[in-house]
């Protein structure tokens, strides 16, 4: 009797999410999630660095045989894990190789969740320096949003429209401490009293 399948740690939606979930399940069966993740990263890196590879993968006019040949060459050259090669073959057969980049991003989400990594996004009007990011990391790591045994991965996004302050998003929670939201609340109160 085979072991029970490992359930993906988070539910993903959309076609790219479906493919990423299938890739995760297949690699979990082989106990090769980490190797699969490395293969996916290697291919993503190749696509982002080599414009010709990116162009070929996103060309819907390629014949099925040409797409399969591209998959075969990439698999051999990059020494991709068999589950990643199989995914590419399925994508080639369905003329969906252009989805690989978004599938890779979704697979990264699954891999992070599987490894206990919680992603936080901090939106600020200007880029934050490392001292502030370290304080935020420490503060968020010790909060109820991360939990024991989890690792925090923090990302700083810049949006000048928030004027100042921060918007912190951890998992599915969001705290808006931006100057723009305070101004909007003040405007709303003022317009209601007039």
Swiss-Prot record:
Keywords: ATP synthesis, CF(0), Hydrogen ion transport, Ion transport, Membrane, Mitochondrion, Mitochondrion inner membrane, Transport. It holds the Pfam family OSCP. One of its GO terms (cellular component) is mitochondrial inner membrane. Its main location: mitochondrion. InterPro entries: ATP_synth_OSCP/delta_N_sf, ATPase_OSCP/dsu. Mitochondrial membrane ATP synthase (F(1)F(0) ATP synthase or Complex V) produces ATP from ADP in the presence of a proton gradient across the membrane which is generated by electron transport complexes of the respiratory chain. F-type ATP synthases consist of two structural domains, F(1) - containing the extramembraneous catalytic core, and F(0) - containing the membrane proton channel, linked together by a central stalk and a peripheral stalk. This is ATP synthase subunit 5, mitochondrial. It comes from Pichia angusta. The lineage of its organism: Eukaryota, Fungi, Dikarya, Ascomycota, Saccharomycotina.
């Amino acid at each position: 009797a085979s072991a029970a399948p490992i359930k993906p740690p988070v539910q993903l939606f959309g076609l790219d999410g479906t493919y990423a979930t299938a890739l995760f399940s297949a690699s979990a069966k082989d106990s090769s999630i980490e190797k699969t993740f490395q293969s996916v990263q290697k291919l993503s890196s190749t696509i982002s660095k080599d414009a010709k590879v990116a162009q070929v993968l996103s060309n819907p006019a390629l014949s099925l045989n040409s797409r399969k040949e591209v998959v075969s060459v990439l698999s051999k050259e990059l020494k991709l894990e068999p589950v990643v090669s199989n995914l590419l073959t399925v994508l080639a057969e369905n003329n969906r190789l252009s989805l690989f980049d978004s599938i890779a991003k979704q697979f990264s989400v699954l891999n992070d969740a599987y490894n206990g990594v919680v992603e936080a996004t901090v939106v600020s009007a200007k880029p934050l320096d490392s001292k502030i990011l370290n304080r935020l990391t420490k503060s968020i790591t010790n909060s109820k949003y991360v939990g024991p045994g989890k690792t925090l991965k923090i990302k700083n996004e810049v949006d000048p429209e928030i004027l100042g302050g921060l918007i912190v998003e951890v998992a599915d929670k969001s705290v808006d401490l931006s100057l723009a939201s305070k101004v909007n609340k003040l405007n709303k109160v003022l317009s209601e009293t007039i």
